[in-house]
Protein backbone atom coordinates (compact mmCIF):
# COMPACT_ATOMS: atom_id res chain seq x y z
CA UNK A 1 0.00 0.00 0.00
CA UNK A 2 1.13 3.51 -0.80
CA UNK A 3 0.05 6.48 1.27
CA UNK A 4 1.20 9.99 1.92
CA UNK A 5 0.39 13.09 3.91
CA UNK A 6 0.99 16.77 3.43
CA UNK A 7 0.80 18.92 6.58
CA UNK A 8 0.70 22.69 6.64
CA UNK A 9 1.02 24.27 10.09
CA UNK A 10 0.86 27.97 10.83
CA UNK A 11 1.88 29.05 14.34
CA UNK A 12 1.15 32.65 15.28
CA UNK A 13 3.16 33.78 18.30
CA UNK A 14 4.14 36.76 20.38
CA UNK A 15 5.74 37.26 23.77
CA UNK A 16 6.95 40.01 26.09
CA UNK A 17 10.50 41.44 26.17
CA UNK A 18 13.17 38.93 27.17
CA UNK A 19 16.68 39.50 28.53
CA UNK A 20 18.17 42.72 27.23
CA UNK A 21 15.71 42.91 24.32
CA UNK A 22 13.19 45.43 25.64
CA UNK A 23 10.63 45.13 22.88
CA UNK A 24 7.71 42.86 22.05
CA UNK A 25 8.62 39.75 20.06
CA UNK A 26 6.14 38.91 17.29
CA UNK A 27 6.26 36.47 14.42
CA UNK A 28 5.05 33.22 12.91
CA UNK A 29 6.47 29.77 12.26
CA UNK A 30 5.25 28.00 9.12
CA UNK A 31 5.86 24.28 8.59
CA UNK A 32 5.35 22.29 5.38
CA UNK A 33 5.80 18.53 5.76
CA UNK A 34 5.45 15.73 3.19
CA UNK A 35 5.52 12.17 4.54
CA UNK A 36 5.25 9.35 1.95
CA UNK A 37 4.74 5.86 3.38
CA UNK A 38 5.14 2.37 1.93
CA UNK A 39 3.40 -0.51 3.73
CA UNK A 40 4.10 -4.15 2.90
CA UNK A 41 2.00 -7.07 4.12
CA UNK A 42 4.46 -9.71 5.34
CA UNK A 43 1.69 -12.13 6.33
CA UNK A 44 -2.09 -11.91 6.68
CA UNK A 45 -1.54 -10.49 10.17
CA UNK A 46 1.76 -8.58 10.07
CA UNK A 47 2.76 -5.56 8.01
CA UNK A 48 5.88 -3.42 7.85
CA UNK A 49 5.81 0.29 6.99
CA UNK A 50 8.50 2.82 6.16
CA UNK A 51 7.77 6.54 6.35
CA UNK A 52 10.19 9.30 5.38
CA UNK A 53 9.72 12.91 6.45
CA UNK A 54 10.59 15.78 4.11
CA UNK A 55 9.90 19.42 4.79
CA UNK A 56 10.79 22.97 5.61
CA UNK A 57 10.16 25.21 8.62
CA UNK A 58 10.23 28.98 8.11
CA UNK A 59 10.36 31.70 10.75
CA UNK A 60 8.96 35.13 9.87
CA UNK A 61 10.19 37.83 12.24
CA UNK A 62 7.57 40.59 12.25
CA UNK A 63 9.57 43.38 13.89
CA UNK A 64 12.03 46.05 12.79
CA UNK A 65 14.19 45.36 15.85
CA UNK A 66 17.24 43.08 15.73
CA UNK A 67 17.02 40.00 17.96
CA UNK A 68 19.40 37.24 18.99
CA UNK A 69 16.39 34.92 19.33
CA UNK A 70 14.49 35.47 16.07
CA UNK A 71 14.95 36.53 12.45
CA UNK A 72 13.66 35.62 8.99
CA UNK A 73 15.11 32.15 8.37
CA UNK A 74 14.27 28.57 7.41
CA UNK A 75 15.39 25.02 8.15
CA UNK A 76 17.07 24.47 4.77
CA UNK A 77 19.89 26.78 5.80
CA UNK A 78 22.68 26.06 8.26
CA UNK A 79 22.96 28.44 11.20
CA UNK A 80 25.35 28.96 14.11
CA UNK A 81 23.62 26.23 16.15
CA UNK A 82 21.71 24.33 13.45
CA UNK A 83 22.28 22.00 10.51
CA UNK A 84 19.97 22.73 7.59
CA UNK A 85 18.30 20.06 5.44
CA UNK A 86 14.98 19.12 3.81
CA UNK A 87 15.21 15.55 5.13
CA UNK A 88 13.54 14.69 8.43
CA UNK A 89 13.21 11.50 10.47
CA UNK A 90 12.72 8.02 9.01
CA UNK A 91 10.14 5.85 10.78
CA UNK A 92 9.87 2.06 10.63
CA UNK A 93 6.82 0.36 12.15
CA UNK A 94 5.86 -3.29 12.48
CA UNK A 95 2.14 -3.91 13.14
CA UNK A 96 0.26 -7.04 14.15
CA UNK A 97 -3.44 -7.40 13.35
CA UNK A 98 -4.93 -8.87 16.52
CA UNK A 99 -8.58 -8.83 15.42
CA UNK A 100 -10.29 -7.92 12.15
CA UNK A 101 -13.94 -8.53 11.30
CA UNK A 102 -13.47 -7.54 7.66
CA UNK A 103 -16.63 -6.17 6.06
CA UNK A 104 -18.89 -7.03 8.99
CA UNK A 105 -19.63 -5.34 12.32
CA UNK A 106 -16.95 -5.69 14.96
CA UNK A 107 -13.50 -4.70 16.16
CA UNK A 108 -10.21 -4.03 14.43
CA UNK A 109 -7.17 -4.04 16.73
CA UNK A 110 -3.56 -3.35 15.75
CA UNK A 111 -0.50 -3.69 18.01
CA UNK A 112 2.58 -1.89 16.74
CA UNK A 113 6.24 -1.32 17.54
CA UNK A 114 8.79 0.70 15.67
CA UNK A 115 11.94 2.77 15.49
CA UNK A 116 12.44 6.46 14.69
CA UNK A 117 15.78 7.21 13.01
CA UNK A 118 16.81 10.88 13.22
CA UNK A 119 18.08 12.97 10.34
CA UNK A 120 20.87 15.53 10.34
CA UNK A 121 18.47 18.50 10.36
CA UNK A 122 19.11 19.22 14.05
CA UNK A 123 20.12 21.88 16.55
CA UNK A 124 23.81 21.57 17.34
CA UNK A 125 23.90 23.44 20.66
CA UNK A 126 21.61 24.56 23.47
CA UNK A 127 19.50 27.56 22.31
CA UNK A 128 18.75 28.47 25.95
CA UNK A 129 22.40 28.88 26.92
CA UNK A 130 23.26 32.31 28.37
CA UNK A 131 26.54 34.18 28.60
CA UNK A 132 27.99 35.29 31.95
CA UNK A 133 26.27 38.68 31.59
CA UNK A 134 22.90 36.89 30.98
CA UNK A 135 22.80 37.85 27.31
CA UNK A 136 22.26 35.36 24.48
CA UNK A 137 24.32 34.64 21.39
CA UNK A 138 22.44 34.37 18.09
CA UNK A 139 20.63 31.04 17.96
CA UNK A 140 17.79 29.08 16.37
CA UNK A 141 15.06 27.14 18.18
CA UNK A 142 13.67 24.89 15.43
CA UNK A 143 14.72 22.05 13.10
CA UNK A 144 13.09 19.08 11.34
CA UNK A 145 14.60 16.48 13.70
CA UNK A 146 15.69 16.42 17.33
CA UNK A 147 18.60 14.06 16.63
CA UNK A 148 17.42 11.23 18.92
CA UNK A 149 16.68 7.61 18.10
CA UNK A 150 13.29 6.66 19.58
CA UNK A 151 11.21 3.58 20.23
CA UNK A 152 7.62 3.77 19.08
CA UNK A 153 4.75 1.71 20.57
CA UNK A 154 1.20 1.88 19.24
CA UNK A 155 -2.27 0.49 19.93
CA UNK A 156 -5.18 0.97 17.52
CA UNK A 157 -8.69 -0.08 18.53
CA UNK A 158 -11.63 0.64 16.24
CA UNK A 159 -15.19 -0.61 15.87
CA UNK A 160 -16.86 -0.96 12.48
CA UNK A 161 -20.62 -0.52 12.32
CA UNK A 162 -22.45 -1.38 9.08
CA UNK A 163 -25.27 1.08 9.67
CA UNK A 164 -27.41 2.75 6.99
CA UNK A 165 -28.24 5.73 9.20
CA UNK A 166 -26.23 8.91 8.66
CA UNK A 167 -26.34 10.00 12.30
CA UNK A 168 -24.79 6.76 13.60
CA UNK A 169 -21.00 6.45 13.13
CA UNK A 170 -19.74 3.71 10.83
CA UNK A 171 -16.27 3.72 12.37
CA UNK A 172 -15.10 4.84 15.80
CA UNK A 173 -12.28 4.17 18.23
CA UNK A 174 -8.87 5.42 19.30
CA UNK A 175 -5.13 5.27 18.63
CA UNK A 176 -2.60 5.40 21.48
CA UNK A 177 1.05 6.13 20.66
CA UNK A 178 4.08 6.26 22.95
CA UNK A 179 7.53 7.44 21.85
CA UNK A 180 10.59 7.32 24.08
CA UNK A 181 14.13 8.52 23.27
CA UNK A 182 16.78 5.80 23.25
CA UNK A 183 19.73 8.17 23.48
CA UNK A 184 20.87 11.76 23.59
CA UNK A 185 21.64 13.41 20.28
CA UNK A 186 25.35 13.74 19.57
CA UNK A 187 24.95 17.43 20.49
CA UNK A 188 23.67 16.77 24.03
CA UNK A 189 19.89 16.93 23.56
CA UNK A 190 17.55 14.30 25.01
CA UNK A 191 14.02 14.53 23.64
CA UNK A 192 10.77 14.31 25.60
CA UNK A 193 8.83 11.11 26.09
CA UNK A 194 5.63 11.63 24.14
CA UNK A 195 2.14 10.19 24.60
CA UNK A 196 -0.46 10.89 21.91
CA UNK A 197 -4.02 9.63 22.22
CA UNK A 198 -6.44 10.25 19.35
CA UNK A 199 -10.14 9.38 19.49
CA UNK A 200 -12.08 9.63 16.24
CA UNK A 201 -15.55 9.07 14.83
CA UNK A 202 -16.41 8.60 11.15
CA UNK A 203 -19.87 9.17 9.73
CA UNK A 204 -20.81 7.97 6.22
CA UNK A 205 -22.39 10.80 4.22
CA UNK A 206 -24.30 8.44 1.85
CA UNK A 207 -23.53 10.86 -1.00
CA UNK A 208 -23.27 9.16 -4.40
CA UNK A 209 -21.52 11.54 -6.82
CA UNK A 210 -17.81 10.94 -7.31
CA UNK A 211 -16.77 14.46 -6.28
CA UNK A 212 -18.80 14.41 -3.06
CA UNK A 213 -17.25 13.41 0.30
CA UNK A 214 -18.00 9.87 1.42
CA UNK A 215 -17.16 10.44 5.08
CA UNK A 216 -17.14 13.09 7.81
CA UNK A 217 -14.61 12.62 10.60
CA UNK A 218 -14.49 14.22 14.04
CA UNK A 219 -11.59 13.74 16.40
CA UNK A 220 -9.94 14.82 19.61
CA UNK A 221 -6.21 14.45 20.22
CA UNK A 222 -4.50 14.47 23.63
CA UNK A 223 -0.76 15.23 23.59
CA UNK A 224 1.53 14.88 26.61
CA UNK A 225 5.29 15.47 26.58
CA UNK A 226 7.75 15.05 29.46
CA UNK A 227 10.72 17.29 30.20
CA UNK A 228 13.44 17.37 27.58
CA UNK A 229 17.09 18.04 28.45
CA UNK A 230 20.04 19.96 27.04
CA UNK A 231 23.39 18.83 28.45
CA UNK A 232 21.60 17.26 31.42
CA UNK A 233 19.56 20.40 32.24
CA UNK A 234 15.82 20.74 31.74
CA UNK A 235 14.87 22.49 28.52
CA UNK A 236 12.40 25.31 29.29
CA UNK A 237 8.80 24.81 28.19
CA UNK A 238 9.43 21.27 26.91
CA UNK A 239 6.93 19.65 29.28
CA UNK A 240 3.41 20.09 27.95
CA UNK A 241 -0.12 18.75 27.90
CA UNK A 242 -2.90 19.92 25.63
CA UNK A 243 -6.00 18.84 23.69
CA UNK A 244 -6.48 19.43 19.96
CA UNK A 245 -9.85 19.07 18.15
CA UNK A 246 -9.96 17.94 14.50
CA UNK A 247 -12.55 17.79 11.73
CA UNK A 248 -12.19 16.29 8.27
CA UNK A 249 -13.70 14.94 5.06
CA UNK A 250 -12.89 11.74 3.15
CA UNK A 251 -13.25 11.31 -0.61
CA UNK A 252 -12.83 7.88 -2.19
CA UNK A 253 -13.23 5.92 -5.40
CA UNK A 254 -12.74 2.19 -5.61
CA UNK A 255 -9.96 2.17 -8.22
CA UNK A 256 -8.32 5.51 -7.42
CA UNK A 257 -7.81 5.29 -3.67
CA UNK A 258 -8.98 7.67 -0.97
CA UNK A 259 -8.21 11.31 -0.26
CA UNK A 260 -8.71 13.08 3.07
CA UNK A 261 -8.54 16.63 4.35
CA UNK A 262 -8.37 17.51 8.06
CA UNK A 263 -8.34 20.78 9.99
CA UNK A 264 -6.74 21.14 13.44
CA UNK A 265 -6.50 23.99 15.92
CA UNK A 266 -4.84 24.47 19.29
CA UNK A 267 -4.03 27.43 21.51
CA UNK A 268 -1.29 26.55 23.97
CA UNK A 269 1.98 28.26 24.89
CA UNK A 270 3.90 24.97 24.99
CA UNK A 271 3.64 24.53 21.21
CA UNK A 272 6.93 26.38 20.82
CA UNK A 273 9.83 25.23 23.04
CA UNK A 274 10.95 28.70 24.07
CA UNK A 275 11.51 30.25 27.49
CA UNK A 276 9.33 33.27 26.71
CA UNK A 277 7.40 35.42 29.23
CA UNK A 278 3.70 36.26 28.75
CA UNK A 279 3.52 34.27 25.53
CA UNK A 280 0.44 34.06 23.33
CA UNK A 281 0.68 31.17 20.86
CA UNK A 282 -1.92 29.48 18.65
CA UNK A 283 -1.61 26.94 15.86
CA UNK A 284 -3.69 26.23 12.75
CA UNK A 285 -3.05 23.09 10.72
CA UNK A 286 -4.32 21.60 7.46
CA UNK A 287 -3.54 17.98 6.62
CA UNK A 288 -4.06 16.31 3.22
CA UNK A 289 -3.79 12.54 2.92
CA UNK A 290 -3.86 9.97 0.13
CA UNK A 291 -4.05 6.19 0.39
CA UNK A 292 -4.15 3.45 -2.25
CA UNK A 293 -3.87 -0.31 -1.97
CA UNK A 294 -1.81 -1.82 -4.79
CA UNK A 295 -2.76 -5.13 -6.40
CA UNK A 296 0.81 -6.32 -6.38
CA UNK A 297 2.40 -9.26 -4.62
CA UNK A 298 6.11 -9.49 -3.87
CA UNK A 299 7.14 -12.93 -5.23
CA UNK A 300 9.09 -14.03 -2.17
CA UNK A 301 6.38 -12.94 0.29
CA UNK A 302 3.17 -14.99 0.57
CA UNK A 303 0.88 -13.18 3.05
List the predicted regions and their residue ranges.
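Transmembrane beta-strands of outer-membrane beta-barrel pores
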Residues: 6-12, 52-58, 98, 115-121, ...
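Surface-exposed strand-loop-strand hairpins of Gram-negative outer-membrane beta-barrel proteins
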Residues: 8-33, 141
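Short loop/turn motifs that connect adjacent beta-strands in outer-membrane beta-barrel proteins
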Residues: 45, 100-109, 123-124, 162-170, ...
Amino acid sequence: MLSGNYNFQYIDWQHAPIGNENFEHVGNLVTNIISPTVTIGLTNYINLSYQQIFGIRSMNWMSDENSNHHRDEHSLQDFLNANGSAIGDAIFNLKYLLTNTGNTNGSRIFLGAGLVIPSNSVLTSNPFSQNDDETYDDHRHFSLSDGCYKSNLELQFYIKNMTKKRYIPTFYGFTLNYKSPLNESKYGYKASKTIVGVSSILFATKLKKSWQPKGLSLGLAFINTSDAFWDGKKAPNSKSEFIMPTIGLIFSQKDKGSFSINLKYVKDNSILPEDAPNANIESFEVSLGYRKTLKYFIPWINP
